[in-house]
Amino acid sequence: RQITAKWNKQQFSKGWRYGEGEALAVVKPGTLLEIWKILKICVKADVIVIMQAANTGLTGGSTPYDNDYDRPIIIINTMRIDNIHIINEGKQIVGLAGSTLYDLEKKLEPFEREPHSVIGSTSVGASIVGGVCNNSGGSLVKRGPAYTELALYAKVNQNGELELVNELEINLGSNEEEILNNLQNRNYNKSDIIQSNKLASDNDYSNIVRQINSNVPARYNADKRLLYGVSGSAGK
């Protein structure tokens, strides 16, 4: 789905709280593979890409901000891709690009578990991925910031080429199309999930938050300790 009419783009180019600017188009892919194909076109055309989920406007990072950019902007809205896979008997989940904290909360209820974050925008569709990209801690001090070393993401390498990085620790295939389709359709078995030592949460937080005499806050933005892959990437 592609949106180019100015009036129809407004709900995507203007944040609920703040942030507003012009975008050449808004694209709403329905699969992970469609995101990949759109990104390839955008990289080749040398346009700015803003990845967007619910556009809650809490951080201002999911919309253009003013109109002083040096290149056209394409907004890729991921909310159609909202699958959540429960794995390892409910101990872990795989949240696709547009999956939300609200849906995660419902899916975890049978396992008597709760999401990593409870934030003000949970009820309006705040995404799991958005929280990880911003190390969002939410309103509950005891849960700490969102953090993972397990992710599948695209990046532009030093040669200006689009590259798919699989750090998810799930065997999904050998090429981009195979990997993305297998993940989208949950075409993997328990035996494909690698039991690694990579972290899916901030395991130091429980100690840090107890340091009541420290001059350093337990949680703060751009904490270098929590920068890894997509974690703390601010959606870049």
Task: For every predicted segment, state its role.
Residues 51-55, 62, 78, 97, ...:
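Glycine-rich, histidine-containing beta strand-loop boundary motifs that form or position
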Residues 23, 29, 48-51, 117-120:
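Proline-rich low-complexity regions
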Residues 85-87, 97, 101-102, 106-236:
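FAD-binding subdomain of flavoenzyme oxidoreductases
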Residues 1-44, 56-94, 236:
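N-terminal flexible segment immediately upstream of the FAD-binding catalytic core
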